[in-house]
Regions:
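Generic hydrophobic, helix-prone segments enriched in Leu/Val/Ile
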Residues: 30-31, 94, 157-160
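Hydrophobic beta-strand residues in large extracellular and virion-surface proteins
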Residues: 37, 56, 127-131, 159
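Noncatalytic modules at the cell exterior or secretory-pathway interfaces
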Residues: 30-33, 85-86, 116-136
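Proprotein-processing/basic-patch segments
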Residues: 132-166
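Mid-protein regulatory/catalytic core that forms ligand/cofactor-binding pockets
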Residues: 1-86
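Histidine (H) residue identity feature
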Residues: 26-29, 96, 153
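Hydrophobic transmembrane signal anchors and adjacent membrane-proximal interface regions, especially
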Residues: 37, 99, 143-145
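Extended, solvent-exposed segments with strong compositional bias
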Residues: 2-9, 69-122, 139-141
């Protein structure tokens, strides 16, 4: 599938899903799952004020929804290639989603009570990440995901699993 190599992905409806091998050993216990990515809404050409409710799910469990304020083209993205039209989406917001043993948050703000136990990481060979626009979303403003070659942050989607051992 070509999407794993994409540096810019956008859609107005639906979701994208990634399956990542779960390498937890039997003596390791998840303490925190963190995802970092640069995202924005999606609008034909661009619109800095275009809210979109972006829902994150892990292993089939919706963990929370972030409302992106817009799809930005007011200034050129630091990494956005010169060949990309300056009127199109240029950059997003760098977001940090964290799931702990107590709840889920984004950038230090609580999103939901979903916790690591709910995700059943110990019993799954994969960690399945879904990012998208829910069918019942209030703000259906699409989604843009920026990889390491677009936007302002030189990174792809990063997923880190912190664990303890016994």
């Amino acid at each position: 599938n070509e999407r794993i190599n994409a540096s810019l992905l956008w859609f107005s409806d639906g979701y994208v899903e990634y399956k990542i091998p779960n390498t937890l050993e039997h003596n390791q216990h998840p303490e925190m799952l963190e995802m970092s990515l640069e995202i924005a809404s999606e609008f034909p050409i661009s619109n800095n004020t275009w809210p979109s409710d972006i829902t994150f799910s892990i292993n089939g469990i919706p963990v929370g929804t972030f409302t992106s304020p817009g799809n930005y083209s007011d200034v050129r993205g630091k990494l956005t290639p010169k060949w990309w039209d300056e009127n199109y989406s240029q950059y997003g917001l760098l977001k940090h989603l964290r799931i702990t043993n107590t709840n889920t948050g984004i950038d230090g703000e609580k999103l939901s009570d979903v916790n690591l136990t709910d995700l059943q990481l110990k019993s799954s060979p994969f960690i399945t990440i879904r990012i998208g626009i829910a069918k019942d979303a209030k703000n259906k403003g699409g989604l843009t995901i920026f990889g390491k070659d677009f936007g302002n942050h030189p990174q792809n989607i990063l997923l880190s699993l912190f664990y303890s051992e016994n």
